[in-house]
């Protein structure tokens, strides 16, 4: 008789035996099964929710145990749709944690059907509201040494975890209480994204870095951020409080902290890291009073909470929520008088309908209809106000940007103007049309200042116009908010290290004009170039090794520098950053980044806004004509530009 060790999704811990089987035979069968399934038994981890069985992979000559699809919350369906997450019910059998979970409900990007450069960001599993699951990668040796069940601090065999120190890169690392844990939060504009994407595979990071890596799904779009509480009587506030996607993240992080020892990790040695909306999520989890102090080390890639796309007011979120209700034929006018009826209606609407209809409120480049909301609870105030009273003396931050943050979004929002493969010679009138569209919510004075700042005065005007718009988008929405926030973090006591990724990878499928795209650094930080089956150049493999090392060193020490390497802390007074590049001729340290351009956004433009507000008033005082006002602005910018040449950045 063949005996299979394959397990169903949940197996009972014991099965009733027929009374006619003699006890000696039972023992023989038990010993035989133990021998056959012994390897699989090593893959069972006792968590606080129940036992889970993963799978073993060998990477770079090292064994890693991988657990995918561990539920951390009840499926947020039916009455739980739009509500805060509820912890998963414990299970008693062994849970099969070898398959990928569903992706939270979202729409696919299909502007370029069949194009792999776009497809890598689309869901690679079925979409479902039942999506709140965790993934864990744990080095096998460390997990078997330190892994302890959540109920006793011991190994399954009853022995205490040993106190050996592991060696990494020749440096002794004190892992007596377990390994460091890195927790990844994916991006996608709070509208899309999935922890299951191939680019987020952490096999190499866990194996080479000798760290535990985890990731999880969280709700996006209206399912994660519908905010209606202010419109309803107080007793209905929990029907759609908003920010439940952030509450999902918080619950997953707490679950991982509670179960760190079970996987061989140290719950006091945790680092959050993420990119774009995932980076802003890291920011939110570090700063929110709900999770403050839960983790004190974070890596933020191309995204901070002060970015225009990364937060919205309660009023704006309510406006968008009411529009969605009406688009779903559930009558938002009844929210105050009959909220139960409205929410019952919204919970009866097909998930696909909500997923599609929510995009009706997309209002222009990087103006997504869902974002973290200033709700008075998870986010009590706007990000920079929260920063004013923050005490961050024990916090370590690694943050940065890529060189061409804006081109990806420019292409998608103005697809009728640009080609993904070839550069476009853009006439001045089209340039002005696009710039006025992007910055249409700014005052006229601000728009004129922005256009002046990003007008090319040399070279081929047509191609330069395209490049300058990309720079304006990248600076405004990503690099300069990051720059501003990094300075504020340092001022509040955090230890901040800043990087700037400038390498255009040889594997890029996008046109040369798009440069170093938003998200291009992810594969390098995850160590993908170390995978010899992938087509990277030798210098790129070295860069991948260096960048993975920076992540690991930061997770272990709070400082991304390698032994003997200089990487000073970043501050407003000394804005030193580290350049990740394959070009050995480039100095690794510089000042900025983009200090002059970011001074325009962070220091000068707010003054233009205040001046415009003064002149636009309808008081009896004399006002400056728009023409003189704009000439004055242009003159001031010119003076600033002249002064820049005497500064070192």
Curated annotation (Swiss-Prot):
Belongs to the type-B carboxylesterase/lipase family. Keywords: Cell membrane, Disulfide bond, Glycoprotein, GPI-anchor, Hydrolase, Lipoprotein, Membrane, Neurotransmitter degradation, Serine esterase, Signal, Synapse. Its main location: other. It comes from the Eukaryota. The gene is Ace. The keyword Membrane applies. Its EC number is 3.1.1.7. A lipid is attached at residue 619 (GPI-anchor amidated serine). Residues 1-38 form the signal peptide. Homodimer; disulfide-linked. The active unit is formed by non-covalent association of the 55 kDa and 16 kDa subunits. Gene3D superfamilies: alpha/beta hydrolase. Coiled coil: none annotated. This is Acetylcholinesterase. Changing residue 328 to V: No effect on apparent molecular weight. Changing residue 174 to S: Decrease in apparent molecular weight of 55 kDa subunit.
């Amino acid at each position: 008789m063949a005996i299979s060790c394959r397990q169903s999704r949940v197996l009972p811990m014991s099965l009733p035996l027929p009374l006619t089987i003699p006890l000696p035979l039972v023992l023989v069968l038990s010993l035989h099964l133990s021998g056959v399934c012994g390897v699989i038994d090593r893959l069972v981890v006792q968590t606080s929710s129940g036992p889970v069985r993963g799978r073993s992979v060998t990477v770079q000559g090292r064994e890693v145990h991988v657990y995918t699809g561990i539920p951390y919350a009840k499926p947020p369906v039916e009455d739980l749709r739009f509500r805060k997450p509820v912890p998963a019910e414990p299970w008693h059998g062994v849970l099969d944690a070898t398959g990928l979970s569903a992706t939270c409900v979202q729409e696919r990007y299909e502007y370029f059907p069949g194009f792999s450069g776009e497809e890598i960001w689309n869901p690679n599993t079925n979409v479902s509201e039942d999506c709140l699951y965790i993934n864990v990668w744990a080095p096998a040796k460390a997990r078997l040494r330190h892994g302890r069940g959540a109920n006793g601090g011991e190994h399954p065999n009853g022995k205490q975890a040993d106190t050996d120190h592991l060696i990494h890169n020749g440096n002794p690392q004190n892992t007596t209480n377990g390994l460091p844990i890195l927790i990844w939060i994916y991006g996608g504009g709070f509208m899309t994204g999935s922890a299951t994407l191939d680019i987020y595979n952490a096999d190499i990071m866990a194996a080479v870095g000798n760290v535990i890596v985890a990731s999880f799904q969280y709700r996006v779009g209206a399912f994660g951020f519908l905010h209606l509480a202010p419109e309803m009587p107080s007793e209905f506030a929990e029907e759609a409080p908003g920010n439940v996607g952030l509450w999902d993240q918080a619950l997953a992080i707490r679950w991982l902290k509670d179960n760190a020892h079970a996987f061989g990790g140290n719950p006091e040695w945790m680092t959050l890291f993420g990119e774009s909306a995932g980076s802003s999520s890291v920011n939110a989890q570090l700063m929110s009073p709900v999770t403050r102090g839960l983790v004190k080390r974070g890596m933020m890639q191309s995204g901070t909470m002060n970015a225009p796309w990364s937060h919205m007011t309660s009023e704006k979120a309510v406006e968008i929520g009411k529009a969605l209700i009406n688009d779903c034929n559930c009558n938002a006018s009844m929210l105050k008088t009959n909220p139960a009826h409205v929410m019952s209606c919204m919970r009866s609407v097909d998930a696909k309908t909500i997923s599609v209809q929510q995009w009706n409120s997309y209002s222009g480049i990087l103006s997504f209809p869902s974002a973290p909301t200033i709700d008075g609870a998870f986010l009590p105030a706007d990000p920079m106000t929260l920063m004013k009273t923050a005490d961050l003396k024990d916090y370590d931050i690694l943050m940065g940007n890529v060189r061409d943050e804006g081109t990806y979004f420019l292409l998608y929002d103005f697809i009728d103007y640009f080609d993904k493969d070839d550069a476009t010679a853009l006439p001045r009138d089209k340039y002005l049309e696009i710039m006025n569209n992007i910055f249409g919510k700014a005052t006229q004075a601000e728009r004129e200042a922005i256009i002046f700042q990003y007008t090319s005065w040399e070279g081929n005007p047509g191609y330069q116009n395209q490049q300058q718009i990309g720079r304006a988008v990248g600076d405004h929405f990503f690099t300069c908010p990051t720059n501003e926030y990094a300075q504020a973090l340092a001022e509040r006591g955090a230890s901040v290290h800043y990087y700037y990724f400038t390498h255009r990878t040889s594997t890029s499928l996008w046109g040369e004009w798009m440069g170093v795209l938003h998200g291009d650094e992810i594969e390098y930080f995850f160590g993908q170039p170390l995978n010899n089956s992938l087509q990277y150049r030798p210098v790129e493999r070295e860069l991948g090794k260096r960048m993975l090392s920076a992540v690991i060193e930061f997770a272990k020490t709070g400082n991304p520098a390698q032994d003997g390497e200089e990487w000073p802390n970043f501050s407003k007074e000394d804005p030193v950053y580290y350049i990740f590049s394959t070009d050995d001729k480039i100095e690794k340290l510089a000042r900025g980044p983009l200090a002059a351009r970011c001074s325009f956004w962070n220091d000068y433009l707010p003054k233009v806004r205040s001046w415009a507000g003064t002149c636009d008033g309808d008081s009896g005082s004399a006002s400056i004509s728009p023409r003189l006002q704009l000439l004055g602005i242009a003159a001031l910018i010119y003076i600033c530009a002249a002064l820049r040449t005497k500064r070192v950045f």
